[in-house]
C-alpha cells in the first residue's frame, strides 16, 4: 500500500527524533517502508505556511522549523511529492458535488484517489465524505467511508 501523508502526520514525524511523538504514530511509521510514504504539494504548502507564520512570531522556533523543513522534509520527499495536476483538479471538483468540503483536504484526497493511495491523517472526519481510504496512525486502523 502507498500512502499520502496529511500535514498533521508530517508534523508528528518531526517529534519522533526527540521522543515526543505519539507512540502509535511512531510504531506505524516503523512498520512501513519510507518509499511507500508520499506527500501532496498541498501538504508542502501547508507546512510552509506554518513555518512562515511561526517565523513571524518566534524567531528561534521559526529557525528550527525552517531548518527542519529545508533539511528534512523537502529532501526526504523530493522524489515523493505528488503534484496537483489536471486529473487531480478534476477529481477534486467532483468531490465538491453534492457536498462541499475543505479544498485543501479535497485536493489531498483527490491526489490519493487518483494515485490509488490511502490518506494518513488524524482528521478522519474531514476525509470520510470523499470516499478515500483513510488510515489514522494515532489509532492505527484503516477507516473506509462505509464505517
Stretches found by the model and what they are:
Residues 14-17, 51, 96, 131, ...:
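Short, flexible helix/strand-to-coil boundary loops that buttress conserved ligand/catalytic motifs
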Residues 49-54, 63, 75-120, 147:
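Active-site neighborhoods of divalent-metal-dependent phosphate/nucleic-acid chemistry enzymes
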Residues 1-2, 109, 113-147:
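Acidic, PIN/NYN-like endoribonuclease modules and their adjacent C-terminal/linker elements
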Amino acid at each position: 500500500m502507498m500512502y499520502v501523508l496529511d500535514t498533521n502526520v508530517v508534523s508528528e514525524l518531526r517529534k519522533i527524533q526527540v521522543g515526543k511523538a505519539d507512540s502509535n504514530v511512531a510504531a506505524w511509521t516503523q512498520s512501513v517502508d519510507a518509499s511507500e510514504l508520499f506527500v501532496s504539494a498541498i501538504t508542502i504548502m501547508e507546512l510552509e505556511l506554518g513555518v512562515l507564520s511561526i517565523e513571524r512570531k518566534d524567531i528561534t522556533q521559526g529557525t528550527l522549523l525552517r531548518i527542519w523543513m529545508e533539511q528534512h522534509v523537502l529532501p526526504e520527499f523530493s522524489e515523493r511529492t505528488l503534484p496537483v495536476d489536471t486529473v487531480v483538479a478534476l477529481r477534486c471538483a467532483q468531490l465538491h458535488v453534492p457536498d462541499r468540503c475543505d479544498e485543501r483536504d479535497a485536493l489531498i484526497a483527490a491526489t490519493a484517489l487518483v494515485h490509488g493511495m490511502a490518506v494518513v491523517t488524524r482528521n478522519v472526519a474531514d476525509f470520510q465524505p470523499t470516499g478515500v481510504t483513510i488510515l489514522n496512525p494515532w489509532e492505527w486502523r484503516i477507516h473506509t467511508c462505509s464505517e
